[in-house]
């Protein structure tokens, strides 16, 4: 029996450690099947709708290709072609889409919006990103960690996230570590630490699961001996540029560069980033920030590190496809995908 059938995935805490590990096992299996051209379509005649309130490259492509690989049909709704939240309420939209589609992906701003979709659609809803959480990214991150250090269980893995730890990646990593059990260091100015409510919830889990989570402003302490260094962008489009200036001034010491790599003491440390990354001035926004703040070798990460042997960001991005495929299969099929991939607690 598939215990994830008809379940929504709005944040990582919606699933147990056992359930997340099942999705990861299925992800590895599906990746191998795709590579071997032996994949079996299990989502034939399923209809999936992808809702985007903001721009997307990796999330949209991963959901679309995953659905197509599995034989599902996809509709994509963007703000310029839908009435969601403008002429039609979220609640009403959820009710009608739930009658037409087997699953809904939502990528937008407010976590409350996706919660309404899940409450009223009566079909699985998957969080492609909100300002609060990015759980589908976490599945790809966990899979990538397993691939890079296959000799280590999660409880032996150390990861440092540096920069803005209050964003959706920082929040989701906090949940991931609390559930899965890897050693997490959030290395950030105190102003950018996660909200106290989330910290309190996760600390209860860490005590239960005997997990080590460190919040520190001290870079050398935070990154010492880690297996993975992770960061995310510091600025977002649409924000006031005064906000950018304030953030950059506080976060500039937390740039992932060669000095930080050296501080880890691990010559094989791997670099993670959910992308897009401002690692050079080849983009419009990168060029603007470089000239205004005199940062010509990247913002949150230098181009040297982004292009180095340490960087596994494109493996990480590819794994969005395999984990999203596993998530859709797990929540849309009443039975297990393969008899040899079952629910158990080993990590």
From Swiss-Prot:
Residues given in the record as carbamoyl phosphate binding sites: 56-59, 83, 107, 134-137, 274-275, 320
Keyword annotations from UniProtKB, A to Z: Cytoplasm, Transferase
Membership in a protein family: Belongs to the aspartate/ornithine carbamoyltransferase superfamily. OTCase family.
Entry keyword annotation includes Disulfide bond: no
Gene3D superfamilies the UniProt entry points to: Aspartate/ornithine carbamoyltransferase
Keyword Acetylation listed: no
Residue positions binding L-ornithine: 168, 232, 236-237
Name by which UniProt lists this protein: Ornithine carbamoyltransferase
Record GO terms (molecular function): amino acid binding; ornithine carbamoyltransferase activity
An annotated GO cellular component: cytoplasm
Principal location: cytoplasm
GO process annotations (BP): arginine biosynthetic process via ornithine; arginine catabolic process to ornithine; citrulline biosynthetic process
Subcellular location: Cytoplasm
Purpose: Reversibly catalyzes the transfer of the carbamoyl group from carbamoyl phosphate (CP) to the N(epsilon) atom of ornithine (ORN) to produce L-citrulline.
Cysteines joined through disulfide linkages: none
EC nos: 2.1.3.3
Catalytic function, reaction form: carbamoyl phosphate + L-ornithine = L-citrulline + phosphate + H(+)
Domain of life: Bacteria
